[in-house]
């Protein structure tokens, strides 16, 4: 038994022995030759590249089974720019470089490693070794680290079977290599005596990877772009060759490519290999080292020290740049700024020097920065001083910021300049607590208390810096993430700032600072503010906005917080819309979107509902790759909603996405407005610009916004202060106003109306303009009462403008000089490589801007002159770089795109009043002996920099321009010279004939445009003169040949129409006319000119006009004579009917146009147009089908639609030159090609040189167009062309006013028993012989009231009373005529205009209010009000016009009731003149619970609704007419007569059977499709002329009821 146990233990020991996986035999010494290659260039083998070859011999002693000792000897390296090759370069082809003794000693220090299962598990280095040297030695050990077999417990059964075969094997395992702990794929292949092991690293599956990233925190997470849009793609493959179980060769090949739009543009490549040389016994042992145990993974300790120094400054434990002496740094910086000072103009070289200065400043200590200040800054010119300040701010280390703040406090840098410099600090690459604390101290300092711009910039910068280390971003710093205690500390600081704030602006600034910080723990404080109804609305809205940077960190939390805010109708509409806007950017899932859609469908506030619909619709259409999932979800939820917003809603959201899906790149423009009902200013306006480049998403790259609360009060109070020079002295007007006010007060007293006081605090009224850049609030400009008061007090004295102070301010000559260096962006990523060097991939865009100039304003008695002299100079370079760094060498490749602009400018503008003529002159001057230069250069560059042994001397980089040979062949030389206007223009360069962005990055191009003026100054002048209106005779306007045969009407009415038209023209010509002259003269040197005269003659009401335009210009190329243009346009519109009867009986209802144009130089082209704007056959049929007699308001609103002109006929005769004819022909061909699928054409023979065009717009939807064009040779027809919805002109009187109310206003209709409120709520309430208050301004200072009553108990006619502050107006209709009394005095119709009263036709009167108007036809009172009003707190039967449907029934004493009778009684004006009809008022059948009126579907709906509303049965049962549809497989049938249906929300109570006629048509026919679309929205009006297909009995409701 014992023997069995012993044998088992021996077998187990043998199995556990590492001998089978052992690479080296104990007590043996091996010598391997190491070769390492660095290559930087383009991803092509046909271009040069910078290459460095490092070689040495490696002594390796296997001490035992586990440990090996190593030492590097015979180290040498060479570097040059040579062509790329698949083979290793020969060392002789490269330039030999010298390695200093100090660096060689570090590399030759021994090191020790432990190997387990073939893998290097531990490494020990000498205590004297440097970190960079350790990483170099790791790269050699990395070549010996190999797992020869898969771990048994991780092998699959197939792999175990393959293991027995041993010919090949594949397995995956996690393994630590030089580049991190990642998944590695092994392949083992047996080739005779050789065994080849290959392993590749999967960087997508890494547990840890030593890398850093800076400057990426301003981007947003785009999950859809992560895989496809990788900017840097590394690839690493190892190959091990064993022969007879001995390692003969080991090689690793790594490629790092930078990709743009999916194409590789630059690459860096490393190759390393060890080759077996000899094996022997150990003769001279390598010294054993006993340093701390470390891993094989690349050590970022050196990078960590650099990061700590940048972030902590002199407080860091180690200064990694201590080896560079202070004198060396100061000397280099002195040389840099000396060269900048020598450059009078900014060039790309200046930009390069600035980038070097930024890099050098980051290495400096406080003491060294002081030395720079005393030795360089104080002795430099102003330009250099400004550049030094901005480069210190761009450097953004703790030391440079501390140095700047020191000089802020000493005021050697002005506070305004300090505020500007802090904007660059916001973008620092190395944010830290130390920097944040410095900025907070500055914000709380006494200096900042005195200078608000500095304090604001300090707080906003502090918030942005805190985000860099306390929030989750795409940056990958080496320091550990901020602890919870650190986050809580800054949340407390910012919230304490909020709580200590006295003004709204201060609180907003605190929240914007907190928003910039983006700390996840701040969500708890923000939620409390959002949900606290005691907080001002502006604070709650700003708290919602402060959640913006948490959208990627905690999207579900934000949705959980904001969804209840959005759904709670007790919240203000603007807060709810802001919550929705912020919630949508968290990319919600479908269940959340379903909640949003459900709320939208049941929403009582029209602004909220419309804004919600627009947001969902715009997101559903987005092509932004980062919104693709959200777009699909929004499209899905919108499929199931029937909601359609009203057109007049001002709260909206729109976006313009411009993206290329293949490149994952593009831009998007967003625009959003948020309004509320009781404000004429928007509550929020935002315009933003976001970008996606190669999958990198910048959500808020730039955004401007305006937000305000109660700012209308500030404006009104300011206007009161600016009210001019005393009060009116008109005693009569004063008595009338007092009388009107007294009547309004009596109404208030009798009805016990409680004033609707706005619950706003004038002290909290404010507005804020803000600029957001790279997700940071950058600038906040507050405007409040105090700010405006200061301006008013400065320039207004005793109600009058202080002209002298204003003139003194304006006429001061102002010289200015601006120099600003900045980085538009800077980002870098550092990753390890298999050769032991870090690879830094960076992108930056250093820029310098200089503007020198002078501005002056001269004011004269009747004019003013502005002169601006400036010389702007801009230079910028975009650098994309991949760089290897070692103390012994710096190598890499970069792609440079440089641009430069230098242009001296002089601009003069003069405005002058001469002899009743206004003259405006603009003059642009090119100065003499000055040159304008615009240049662009692109080139890829390979570079090598080898420091010399003396560190004090700066070594210039060895650069070589490289290019993609195939792309470079596509370039073409440009060398062109022009001379025009006395200016010499040169354009020369070498540019790509066709290009893409990757091609630009891989080719050398240069282009320079110069404009030089060596003679006297060259002036370009534009002069406009506008003359006064003068009286003239209209007889010169002749309408001779204006009618064409194509204009003839049907039914032989043409002759009658023409006689009527000419009679109308003669009547107009007998009246007084007016003429006006406008001239435009453009003048340039060398007698170049363009002169234009525009002469207009019209009658007083613009019924007939003649417009003449004469233009002349100087001859151009190939012209020997002056070019002229003469045009004459005649236009006449018909009389404007005020009733349907007038419209029907009016013979001429068309607009006539005649245009003659003649142009050319030696040869003239002439064209004549006669056009007629008319009604199409379909529109005329609609007018004929109006059989019922309408009166009053329904008649007029139907007139607006019936009088629309939707068709234009044009007849043109022409005589064109061949060139002009060719141009028109090409345009015609382009139109046909663009509408290819809707075009039909046929060959015809028509009259020569004559074209006939007919264009008609479908009048119902106004979104489809038909067009027919007849030329001499062909007839072209375009059918059903989709166009944007157009507004058709109408000839009805006051039509534009009506359409304006429909689009932007709110309307209330009150009949004898039914009311439709401003907020679209319909209810029944009977009017009596006592006045009921229809609508009233119920503010503390009321301006109007509208009342109505029945004339007597049994009458259907009403009497309306309108009380304005000036007078009381009473109107009633008697014997089809309106009787009007003003202050109890009867007024004749001819005197109505002076009281702002107008009669339209025979049945409608309009009374204008201070804001709005009242329309009355004897039976219905229609009140139109603006949709937004500042002081109009309305009350009455029409509701409060606040946009909410759920709070309409507010009684006179301002409390809400659900009892409609109680609501109605509160607005009854009881007096001795009337008898209250208590029985009628109390009878419940006269009241009905309210319901929401359906949204207006189209302009024609109201027409049928009016017919229904005036039908007694319809009024009783609430029925409406609709076309009935029956659908079959191949046909669709429509009821010829409309069928009654119950309104939405009601159900049929009684029904009857009626026989209905149907007409059927094929489903695929054009009419079927059109009628189906119409029938969904209203009655189809065109079915009478269709044949009857069948008759069927249909059950029709006769009464409806609401349950």
From Swiss-Prot:
One Pfam match: VWD
Disulfide cross-links: 1308-1438, 1330-1474
Gene disruption: observed consequences: Simultaneous RNAi-mediated knockdown of vitellogenins vit-1, vit-2, vit-3, vit-4 and vit-5 increases life span, causes accumulation of neutral lipid and an increase in lgg-1 foci in the proximal intestine; however, does not affect fertility or pharyngeal pumping rates. Expression of transcription factors pha-4 and daf-16 are increased.
Function statement: Precursor of the egg-yolk proteins that are sources of nutrients during embryonic development. Together with other vitellogenins, may play a role in modulating life-span, acting via induction of autophagy and lysosomal lipolysis.
Gene Ontology molecular function terms on file: lipid transporter activity; nutrient reservoir activity
Gene behind this protein: vit-3
Protein name as it appears in the record: Vitellogenin-3
Species this protein is from: Caenorhabditis elegans
Keywords: Disulfide bond, Glycoprotein, Secreted, Signal, Storage protein
Subcellular location as annotated: Secreted
Glycosylation sites noted in the Swiss-Prot or TrEMBL record: 1266
Matches recorded under InterPro entries: Lipid_transp_b-sht_shell, Lipovitellin_superhlx_dom, Vitellinogen_b-sht_N, Vitellinogen_open_b-sht, Vitellogenin/Apolipophorin, Vitellogenin_N, VWF_type-D
Tissue-by-tissue expression: Expressed in the intestine of adult hermaphrodites.
Signal peptide: 1-15
GO cellular component, one term: extracellular region
Vitellogenin domain segment(s): 24-685
Location of the VWFD domain: 1306-1475
């Amino acid at each position: 038994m014992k023997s069995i146990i012993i044998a088992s233990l021996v077998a187990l020991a043998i199995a556990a022995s590492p001998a089978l996986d052992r690479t080296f035999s104990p007590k043996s010494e091996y010598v391997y030759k190491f070769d390492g290659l660095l290559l930087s260039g383009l991803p092509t083998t046909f271009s040069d590249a910078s290459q460095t070859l490092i070689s040495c011999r490696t002594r390796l002693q296997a001490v035992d089974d586990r440990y090996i000792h190593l030492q590097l000897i015979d180290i040498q390296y060479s570097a040059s720019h040579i062509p790329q090759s698949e083979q290793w370069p020969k060392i002789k082809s490269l330039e030999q470089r010298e390695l200093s003794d100090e660096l060689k000693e570090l590399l030759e220090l021994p090191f020790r490693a432990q190997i387990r299962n073939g893998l290097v598990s531990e490494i020990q280095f000498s205590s004297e070794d440097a970190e960079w040297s350790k990483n170099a030695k790791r790269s050699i050990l990395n070549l010996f680290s190999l797992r020869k077999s898969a771990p048994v417990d991780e092998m699959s059964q197939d792999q175990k079977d393959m293991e027995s075969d041993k010919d090949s094997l594949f397995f995956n395992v996690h393994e630590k290599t030089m580049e991190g702990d990642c998944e590695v794929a092994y392949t083992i292949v047996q080739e005779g005596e050789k065994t080849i092991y290959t392993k590749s690293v999967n960087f997508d599956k890494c547990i840890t990877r030593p890398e850093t990233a800076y400057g990426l925190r301003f981007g947003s997470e785009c999950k859809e772009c992560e895989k496809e849009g990788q900017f840097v793609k590394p690839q690493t493959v190892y190959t091990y060759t064993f022969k007879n179980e001995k390692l003969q060769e080991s090689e690793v090949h790594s490629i790092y490519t930078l990709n743009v739009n999916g194409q590789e543009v630059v690459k860096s490549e490393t190759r390393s290999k060890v080759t077996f040389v000899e094996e022997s016994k150990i003769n001279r042992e390598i010294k054993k080292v006993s340093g701390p145990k470390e891993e094989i993974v690349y050590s970022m300790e050196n990078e960590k020290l650099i990061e700590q120094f940048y972030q902590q400054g002199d407080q860091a434990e180690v200064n990694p740049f201590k080896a560079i002496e202070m004198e060396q740094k100061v000397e280099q910086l002195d040389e840099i700024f000396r060269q900048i000072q020598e450059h009078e103009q900014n060039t790309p070289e200046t930009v390069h020097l600035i980038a070097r200065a930024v890099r050098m400043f980051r290495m400096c200590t406080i003491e060294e920065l002081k030395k720079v200040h005393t030795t360089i800054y104080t002795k430099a010119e102003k330009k250099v001083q400004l550049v030094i300040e901005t480069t210190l701010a761009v450097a953004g280390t703790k030391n440079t910021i501390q140095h700047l703040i020191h000089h802020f406090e000493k005021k050697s840098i002005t506070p305004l300049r300090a505020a500007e410099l802090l904007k660059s600090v916001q973008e620092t690459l190395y944010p830290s607590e130390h920097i944040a604390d410095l900025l907070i101290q500055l914000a709380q300092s006494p200096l900042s208390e005195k200078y608000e711009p500095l304090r604001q910039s300090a707080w906003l910068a502090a918030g942005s810096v805190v985000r860099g280390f306390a929030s989750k971003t795409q940056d990958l710093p080496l320091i550990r993430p901020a602890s919870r205690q650190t986050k809580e500390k800054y949340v407390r600081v910012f919230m304490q700032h909020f709580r200590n704030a006295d003004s709204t602006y201060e609180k907003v600034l605190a929240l914007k600072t907190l928003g910039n910080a983006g700390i996840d723990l701040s969500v708890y404080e923000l939620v409390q503010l959002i949900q606290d109804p005691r907080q001002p609305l502006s604070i709650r809205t700003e708290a919602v906005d402060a959640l913006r940077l948490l959208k990627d960190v905690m999207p579900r939390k934000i949705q959980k917080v904001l969804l209840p805010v959005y759904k709670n109708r007790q919240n203000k509409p603007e807060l709810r819309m802001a919550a929705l806007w912020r919630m949508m950017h968290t990319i919600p899932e479908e269940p959340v979107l379903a909640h949003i859609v459900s709320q939208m469908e049941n929403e009582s506030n029209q602004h909220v509902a419309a804004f919600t619909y627009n947001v969902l619709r715009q997101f559903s259409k987005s092509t932004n790759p980062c919104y693709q999932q959200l777009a699909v979800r929004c499209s899905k939820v919108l499929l199931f909603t029937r909601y359609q917003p009203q057109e007049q809603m001002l709260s909206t959201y729109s976006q313009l996405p411009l993206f290329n899906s293949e490149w994952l790149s593009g831009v998007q423009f967003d625009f959003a407005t948020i309004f509320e009902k009781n404000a004429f200013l928007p509550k929020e306006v935002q315009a933003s610009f976001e970008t996606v480049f190669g999958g990198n998403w910048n959500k808020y790259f730039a955004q401007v916004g305006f937000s305000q609360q109660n700012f209308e009060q500030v404006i009104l109070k300011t206007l009161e202060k600016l009210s001019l020079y005393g009060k009116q002295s008109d005693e009569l007007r004063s008595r009338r106003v007092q009388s009107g006010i007294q009547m309004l007060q009596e109404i208030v007293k009798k009805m016990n109306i409680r004033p609707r006081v706005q619950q706003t605090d004038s002290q909290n009224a404010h507005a804020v303009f803000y600029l957001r850049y790279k997700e940071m609030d950058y600038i906040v400009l507050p405007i409040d009462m105090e700010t405006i008061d200061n301006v008013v007090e400065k320039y207004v004295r005793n109600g009058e403008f202080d002209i002298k102070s204003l003139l003194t301010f304006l006429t001061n000559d102002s010289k200015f000089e601006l120099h600003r260096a900045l980085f538009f962006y800077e980002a870098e990523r550092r990753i390890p490589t298999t050769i032991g060097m870090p690879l830094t991939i960076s992108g930056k865009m250093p820029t310098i801007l200089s503007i020198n100039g002078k501005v002056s304003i001269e004011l004269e008695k009747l004019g003013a002159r502005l002169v601006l002299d400036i010389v702007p100079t801009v230079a910028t370079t975009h650098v994309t770089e991949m760089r290897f760094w070692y103390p012994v060498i710096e190598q890499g490749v970069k792609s440079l795109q440089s641009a430069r602009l230098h242009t001296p400018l002089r601009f003069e503008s003069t405005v002058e009043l001469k002899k009743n003529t206004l003259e405006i002159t603009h003059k642009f001057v090119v100065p003499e002996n000055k040159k304008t230069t615009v240049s662009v250069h692109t080139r890829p560059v390979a570079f090598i920099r080898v420091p010399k042994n003396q560190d004090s001397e700066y070594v210039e980089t060895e650069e070589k321009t490289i290019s993609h040979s195939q792309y470079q062949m596509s370039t073409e030389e440009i060398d062109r010279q022009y001379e025009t206007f006395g200016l010499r223009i040169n354009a020369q360069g070498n540019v790509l004939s066709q290009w893409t962005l990757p091609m630009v990055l891989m080719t050398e191009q240069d282009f320079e445009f110069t404009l030089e003026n060596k003679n006297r100054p060259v002036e370009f002048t534009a002069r406009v003169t506008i003359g006064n209106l003068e009286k003239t005779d209209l007889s010169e306007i002749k309408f001779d040949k204006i009618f064409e045969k194509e204009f003839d009407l049907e039914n032989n009415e043409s002759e009658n129409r023409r006689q009527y038209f000419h009679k109308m023209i003669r009547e107009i010509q007998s009246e007084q006319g007016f003429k006006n002259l406008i001239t435009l003269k453009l003048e340039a040197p060398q007698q170049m000119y363009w002169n234009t005269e525009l002469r207009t003659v019209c009658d007083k009401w613009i019924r007939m006009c003649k417009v003449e335009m004469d233009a002349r210009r100087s001859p151009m190329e190939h012209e020997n004579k002056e070019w002229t243009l003469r045009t004459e346009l005649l236009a006449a519109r018909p009389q404007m009917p005020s009733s349907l009867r007038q419209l029907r009986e009016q013979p001429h209802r068309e607009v006539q146009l005649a245009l003659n144009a003649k142009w050319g130089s030696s040869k003239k082209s002439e064209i004549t147009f006669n056009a007629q704007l008319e009604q199409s056959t379909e529109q005329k049929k609609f007018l004929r089908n109006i059989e019922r007699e309408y009166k009053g308001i329904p008649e007029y609103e139907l007139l607006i639609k019936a009088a629309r002109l939707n068709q234009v006929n044009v007849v043109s005769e022409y005589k064109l030159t061949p060139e002009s004819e060719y141009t028109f022909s090409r345009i015609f061909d382009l139109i046909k090609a663009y509408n290819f699928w809707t075009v039909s054409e046929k060959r015809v023979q028509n009259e020569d040189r004559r074209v006939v065009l007919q264009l008609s717009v479908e009048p119902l939807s106004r979104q489809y167009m038909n067009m027919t064009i007849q030329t001499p040779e062909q007839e072209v027809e375009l059918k059903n062309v989709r166009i944007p919805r157009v507004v058709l002109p109408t000839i009805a009187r006051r039509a534009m006013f009506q359409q304006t109310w429909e689009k932007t206003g709110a309307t209330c209709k009150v009949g004898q028993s039914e009311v439709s409120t401003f907020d679209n709520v319909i209810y029944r309430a009977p009017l009596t012989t006592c006045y009921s208050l229809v609508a009233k301004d119920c503010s503390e200072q009321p301006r109007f009231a509208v009342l109505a009553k029945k004339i007597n108990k049994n009458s259907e006619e009403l009497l309306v009373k309108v009380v304005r502050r000036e007078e009381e107006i009473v109107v009633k209709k008697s014997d089809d005529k309106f009787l009007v009394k003003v202050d109890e005095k009867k007024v004749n119709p001819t005197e109505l205009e002076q009281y702002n009263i107008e009669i339209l036709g025979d049945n409608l009167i309009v009374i204008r209010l201070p804001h709005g108007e009242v329309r009355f036809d004897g039976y219905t009172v229609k009140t139109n009000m603006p949709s937004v009003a500042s002081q109009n707190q309305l009350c009455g039967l029409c509701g409060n016009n606040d946009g909410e449907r759920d709070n309409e029934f507010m009684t006179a004493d301002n409390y809400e009731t659900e009892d409609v009778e109680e609501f109605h009684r509160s607005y009854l004006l009881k007096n001795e003149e009337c008898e209250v009809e208590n029985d009628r008022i109390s009878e419940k059948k006269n009241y009905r619970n309210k319901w929401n009126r359906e949204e207006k579907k189209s302009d024609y709906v109201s027409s049928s609704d009016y017919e229904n509303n005036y039908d007694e049965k319809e009024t009783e049962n609430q029925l409406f007419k609709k076309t009935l549809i029956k659908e079959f497989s191949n046909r669709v049938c429509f009821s010829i007569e409309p069928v009654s249906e119950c309104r939405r929300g009601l159900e049929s109570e009684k029904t009857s059977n009626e026989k209905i006629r149907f007409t059927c048509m094929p489903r695929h026919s054009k009419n079927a499709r059109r009628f189906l679309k119409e029938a969904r929205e209203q009655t189809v009006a065109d079915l009478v002329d269709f044949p009857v297909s069948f008759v069927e009995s249909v059950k029709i409701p006769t009464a409806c009821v609401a349950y």
